[in-house]
């Protein structure tokens, strides 16, 4: 009997879209699906490392670049709109050909607007139903366009918790929602086990007394997790490496540049610090446990992955990236994290202020395989 097959493709707008798909793909594999992943570059490298049994198909990404200065980002993205439109058309045509060859039973797109097929159940994954832009008029206009486009998909799956106790505020819980069926999936984290019961929360499935247990001799002051499009990825990497070495404290920085051949490649080190290109999940968990503070962009997937470890979080949103700026402000208001603008960030000041900051624990409801089964059944009704 032929196994059901699924083709899934995450957008290449930061590694988070790929890493959050790992949990979902593993769940599909447990349900007996043959998984095909359409991607390229860094995303392919990190997914191949985590998912050796999946089949990979080459699909070019959007290849978006950011501005060096935040105030330029809207203009830089505006000039890339033709490239984005071309990518949407290209991926749509690519999928029509791939569907004729492989005959997928289900298609899942993580924020790729052209990755759907009219004859096959097609799911769109996003936590941004209300994308925050620099102007309110632009926010409303984009939401109308997005909702109209989402009608081409069978359903929308949202990696968050429905209602007031959510992680992304109005991004995933807007006042007005799309007309297609929605499923709030819970939190996707490749660093924790997927639960098997719909109502389980992470505290019910993980022993918090052991998840943060570490050897004090290996403790570091901070772990810097770098990600996102260039040139901002490199700018943050250099900022954290230089500032950490100036303070002469133990720390680790992960550059967010995975390699197919060297998943745990060490770029450079000295007596106090290490800079890795990327760390596989077990090694990443080890460094998270060792760190007193985690410094990162505050991208949504990173937040989902870090919550179970109950670490003190410091965000440096990508300049001009309104989603991360919104999440940083929201999480700081709830005392879940500290947030600093990159142009004003001073590592010594941030670490001093973090000592006196009253950090609180963000809520976390785990993604569930049983809920996934129910969501799949809804697609075929």
What does each model-identified segment do?
Residues 72-114:
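Conserved nucleotide-sugar donor-binding subdomain of glycosyltransferases
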Residues 2-7, 12, 30-81, 274:
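Conserved nucleotide-sugar phosphate-binding/catalytic loop shared by glycosyltransferases and other
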Residues 283-326:
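A donor-sugar binding/catalytic signature common to diverse glycosyltransferases
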Residues 118-184, 189-190:
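Active-site-proximal region of nucleotide-activated glycan assembly enzymes
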Residues 10-22, 230-234:
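A short, glycine/small-residue-rich beta-strand->loop->alpha-helix junction that serves as a flexible
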Residues 80-83, 336-381:
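Leloir-type glycosyltransferase catalytic cores
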Residues 18-28, 43:
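Short amphipathic alpha-helix
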Residues 172-173, 186-293:
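Donor-nucleotide binding loops and adjacent catalytic segments primarily
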């Amino acid at each position: 009997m032929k196994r059901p097959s699924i083709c899934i493709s995450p957008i290449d707008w930061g590694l988070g879209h790929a890493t959050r798909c790992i949990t979902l793909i593993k769940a599909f594999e447990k349900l007996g699906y043959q998984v095909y992943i359409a991607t390229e570059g860094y995303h392919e490298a990190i997914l191949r490392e985590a998912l050796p049994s999946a089949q990979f198909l080459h699909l070019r990404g959007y290849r978006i670049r950011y501005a060096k200065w935040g105030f330029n980002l809207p203009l830089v993205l505006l000039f890339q709109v033709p490239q984005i439109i071309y990518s949407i058309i290209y991926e749509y045509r690519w999928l029509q050909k791939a569907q004729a060859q492989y005959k997928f039973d289900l298609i899942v797109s993580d924020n790729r607007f052209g990755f759907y097929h009219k004859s096959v159940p097609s799911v769109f994954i996003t936590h941004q139903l209300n994308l925050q832009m620099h102007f309110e008029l632009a926010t409303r206009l984009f939401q109308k366009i997005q909702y109209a486009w989402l009608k081409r998909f069978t359903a929308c799956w949202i990696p968050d918790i429905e209602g007031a106790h959510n992680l992304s505020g109005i991004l995933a819980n807007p006042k007005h929602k799309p007309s297609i069926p929605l499923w709030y999936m819970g939190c996707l984290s490749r660093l924790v086990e997927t639960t098997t019961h719909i109502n389980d929360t992470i505290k019910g499935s993980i022993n918090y007394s052991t998840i943060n247990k570490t050897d004090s001799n290996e403790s570091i002051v901070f772990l810097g997790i770098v990600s996102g499009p260039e040139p901002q990825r490199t700018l943050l990497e250099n900022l954290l490496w230089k500032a950490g070495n100036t303070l002469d404290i133990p720390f680790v920085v992960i550059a967010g540049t995975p390699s197919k051949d060297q998943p745990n490649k060490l770029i450079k080190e000295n007596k106090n610090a290490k800079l890795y290109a990327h760390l596989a999940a077990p090694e990443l968990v080890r460094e998270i446990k060792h760190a007193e503070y985690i410094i990162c962009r505050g991208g949504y997937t990173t937040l989902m992955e870090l919550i179970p470890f109950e670490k003190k979080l410091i965000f440096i949103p990508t300049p001009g990236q309104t989603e991360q700026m919104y999440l940083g402000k929201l999480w700081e208001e709830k005392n879940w994290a500290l947030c600093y603008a990159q142009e004003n960030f001073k590592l010594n000041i941030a670490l001093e202020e973090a000592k006196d900051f009253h950090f609180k624990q963000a809520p976390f409801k785990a993604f569930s395989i049983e809920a996934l089964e129910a969501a799949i059944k809804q697609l075929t009704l």
